[in-house]
């Protein structure tokens, strides 16, 4: 049973509530009508307070001068007695004066108003006492006993303070005993706040629902929305959907949440991938013409920008303009940042020019700052418009009087590095120093990265060492870049050197550093060093990823280290990493080379059980293994199975394996048949295909076939390689044949009859 319902059923137990006059006027909002001038009212207050202070408290009742002041003061506003009570300075004096005033109340012209306001001041004093509970209860009982109506302020104070002291029942009693006409929005706000803070959500929403009715006499206001929305969201009392519905109900009364709360809620929705819901909320608020500011729109614009939804961003900005919501400096930043990231730099520059200088809702002018300029300069650099970026930097310094910073120059440096203009990038570093801007680690990483990308590893090392001398230290990114660059050119010794330097510099390696080292060591087949790096990786609290496992398994397979292969597979299983098709293909190739076809079959079966279909690489590895041991029948059987039972079609590599195998056996007919099948199935032969066929041909007996194949290569635009030329030079040794070979090299047909060779034609081959 709710508190409000239980209290409602106990109302008859309060005898005082049977007085209809008390019910009707238990509380009201005083609208004092000043009857004398403000200066005269102040004079009355000062005179009364001084007289009270001079007169001993036990003589107040008998003091004729005080009695006279009561009579004369009653001609003034009832507020006089509230002010007198406040200026007494303590609860004890305030309650004594109230009791004195009550005893003399027959002399007051506006008794109820005067006593109500004086009691309000006493309640204010009581609430600030160290232990106010009993005092507040006593004052409330006095109001009931003496039939003194409470002011709205006094009512709110009692409801709030009782609630804070955990006396929610008492708060509700105060509210319930009010006349319905006195339960205005201000009082209801306090009640709702107290109920929500004490977890009585249902009771709070009963009061709120009355306020949210269409024809409500006391509708919600901005304070109502602030109280309710703050509490329900902070305490997770409602779902997002119900909060959205609640905002809509407030919106129908022309009330919007405060800008800070609404911005946070919109941001939360966007974070939860609910940008459409955020859009609907703002649209509904705009439709009902509720007062709104730019920040909530900025939150949604940021979300749309992250998703590169520029079309909807444009629509939202237009809606803002329609309802006269002025964008601010944050709006400008969001728009130009998104446009620059999407490479629409011209539009970003246009927005920048249009919005600068406009006034915001708070009266400030949108002034471009270094962040805006940096965004535009970076955008121009990213699309290669370096000259315009430099011009904007000049304008930034001279026209706008906006000082560039390290970010500004780092953007330019990155632009020049992307364009391969490394010397110009270094010149920008010198300009930084001239402007008394110290290069930072981002500067170093940008140039080192640019130099490494453009094959300037040595240059990158020199630059980095120079920067270190100037006091700019590298970080993990710097060392990662150098290590990766060294590994990419198979200079693993240097990569290990930079790894050690990184440790000396106090930089903790991350997993990517270890992966780069493992990759480099696997490429140069240094298995022992790779194992040591794996151990270091695990000591650092990291684990191998699937790519690293595959590289290591491949390395150990090449080294014929079966023990380590199985160790890696066991480790993978412990780490919860499932083998992928690359893992299985590597293992199948390994077992195939060792003629362990039982393991090959087992691996293929395991592969299917893991939900992985054999790939063209899988079939290629097995077919190659069968061919390498002369099991061509098994190889052909698997080859045909590809076309019949799997979705994988043979590619050029698989055809070449078979053609090469048959050519080695001298079975040119079978090899040529496979080549013709390639043509029929639209699988393009390559130079390896023709080289295998050429090896099988004898110039004396199969000269025409040789020339036809050479013509096919020309027609297919298949470039011969060094092996092709060596085979053909051996097969075509006569002068006429050498002329044909020269024409073949030049891309001409050779099968048709040719003119007699010039004596110098032979030398043109050299």
Swiss-Prot record:
Belongs to the PPR family. P subfamily. PROSITE patterns: PPR (PS51375). The keyword Transport does not apply. Coiled coil: none annotated. Residues 1-30 form a transit peptide. PANTHER family: PENTATRICOPEPTIDE REPEAT-CONTAINING PROTEIN 1, MITOCHONDRIAL, PENTATRICOPEPTIDE REPEAT-CONTAINING PROTEIN 2. Its main location: mitochondrion. PPR repeats lie at residues 151-181, 184-218, 221-257, 258-292, 293-327, 328-358, 369-404, 405-439, 440-474, 475-509, 510-544, 545-579, 580-614, 615-650, 651-685, 686-720. SUPFAM superfamilies: HCP-like (SSF81901). GO terms for cellular component: mitochondrion. This is Pentatricopeptide repeat-containing protein At3g61520, mitochondrial. InterPro entries: Mito_RNA-Proc/Resp, Pentatricopeptide_rpt, TPR-like_helical_dom_sf. Disulfide bonds: none annotated. It is found in: Mitochondrion. Keywords: Mitochondrion, Repeat, Transit peptide.
């Amino acid at each position: 049973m709710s508190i409000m319902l239980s209290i409602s059923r106990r109302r008859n137990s309060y005898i005082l509530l049977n007085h209809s006059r008390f019910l009707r006027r238990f509380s009201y909002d005083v609208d004092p009508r000043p009857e004398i001038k403000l200066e005269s009212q102040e004079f009355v207050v000062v005179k009364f307070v001084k007289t009270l202070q001079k007169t001993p408290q036990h003589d107040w009742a008998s003091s004729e001068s005080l009695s006279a002041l009561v009579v004369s003061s009653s001609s003034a506003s009832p507020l006089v007695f509230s002010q007198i009570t406040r200026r007494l300075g303590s609860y004890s004096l305030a309650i004594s004066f109230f009791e004195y005033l009550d005893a003399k109340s027959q002399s007051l012209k506006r008794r109820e108003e005067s006593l109500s306001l004086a009691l309000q001041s006493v309640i204010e004093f009581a609430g600030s006492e160290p232990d106010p509970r009993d005092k507040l209860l006593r004052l409330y009982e006095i109001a009931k006993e003496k039939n003194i109506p409470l002011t709205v302020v006094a009512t709110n104070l009692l409801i709030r303070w009782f609630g804070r002291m955990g006396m929610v029942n008492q708060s509700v009693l105060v509210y319930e005993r009010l006349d319905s006409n006195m339960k205005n929005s201000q009082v209801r706000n306090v009640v709702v706040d107290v109920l929500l803070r004490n977890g009585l959500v249902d009771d709070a929403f009963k009061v709120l629902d009355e306020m949210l009715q269409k024809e409500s006499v006391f509708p919600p206001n901005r304070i109502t929305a602030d109280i309710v929305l703050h509490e329900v969201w902070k305490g997770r009392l409602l779902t997002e959907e119900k909060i959205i519905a609640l905002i809509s109900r407030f919106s129908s009364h022309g009330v919007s949440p405060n800008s800070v709360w609404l911005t946070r809620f919109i941001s939360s929705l966007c974070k939860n991938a609910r940008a459409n819901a955020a859009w609907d909320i703002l649209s509904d608020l705009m439709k009902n013409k509720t007062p709104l500011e730019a920040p909530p729109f900025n939150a949604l614009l940021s979300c749309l920008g992250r998703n590169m939804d520029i079309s909807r961003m444009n629509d939202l900005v237009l809606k803002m303009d329609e309802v006269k919501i002025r964008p601010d400096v944050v709006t400008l930043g969001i728009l130009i940042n998104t446009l620059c990231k999407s490479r629409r730099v011209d539009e970003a520059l246009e927005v920048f020019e249009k919005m600068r200088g406009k006034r915001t809702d708070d009266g400030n002018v949108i002034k471009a700052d270094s962040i805006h300029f940096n965004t535009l300069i970076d955008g121009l650099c990213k699309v290669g418009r370096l000259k315009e970026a430099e011009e904007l930097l000049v304008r930034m310094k001279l026209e706008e009087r906006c000082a560039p910073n390290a970010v500004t120059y780092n953007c330019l440096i990155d632009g020049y590095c992307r364009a391969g203009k490394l010397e110009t990038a270094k010149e920008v570093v010198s300009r930084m120093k001239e402007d008394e801007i110290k290069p930072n680690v981002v500067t170093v990483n940008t140039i080192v990265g640019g130099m490494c990308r453009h094959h300037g590893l040595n240059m990158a090392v020199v630059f980095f060492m120079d920067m270190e001398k100037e006091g700019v230290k590298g970080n993990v990114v710097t060392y990662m870049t150098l290590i990766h660059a060294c590994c990419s050119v198979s200079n693993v010794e240097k990569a290990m050197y930079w790894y050690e330097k990184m440790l000396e510099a106090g930089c903790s390696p991350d997993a990517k550093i270890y992966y780069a080292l493992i990759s480099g060591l696997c490429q140069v087949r240094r298995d022992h060093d790779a194992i040591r790096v794996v151990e270091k990786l695990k000591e650092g609290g990291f684990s191998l990823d699937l790519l690293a496992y595959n590289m290591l398994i491949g390395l150990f397979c090449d080294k014929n280290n079966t023990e380590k292969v199985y160790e890696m597979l066991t480790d993978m299983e412990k780490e919860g990493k499932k083998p992928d098709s690359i893992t299985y293909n590597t293992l199948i190739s390994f077992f195939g080379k060792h003629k362990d076809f039982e393991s090959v079959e087992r691996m293929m079966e395991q592969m299917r059980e893991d939900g992985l279909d054999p790939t063209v690489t899988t079939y290629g590895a097995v077919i190659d293994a069968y061919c390498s041991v002369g099991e061509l029948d098994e190889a052909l059987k698997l080859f045909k199975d590809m076309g019949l039972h799997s979705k994988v079609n043979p590619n050029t590599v698989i055809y070449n394996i078979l053609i090469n195998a048959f050519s080695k056996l001298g079975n040119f007919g079978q090899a040529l048949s496979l080549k013709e099948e390639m043509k029929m199935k639209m699988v393009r032969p390559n130079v390896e295909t023709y080289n295998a066929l050429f090896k099988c041909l004898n110039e004396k007996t199969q000269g025409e076939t040789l020339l036809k194949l050479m013509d096919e290569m020309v027609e297919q635009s298949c470039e011969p390689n060094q092996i092709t030329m060596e085979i053909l030079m051996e097969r075509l040794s006569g002068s006429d044949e050498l002329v044909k070979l020269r024409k073949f090299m030049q891309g001409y047909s050779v099968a048709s009859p040719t003119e007699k060779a010039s004596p110098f034609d032979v030398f043109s081959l050299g």
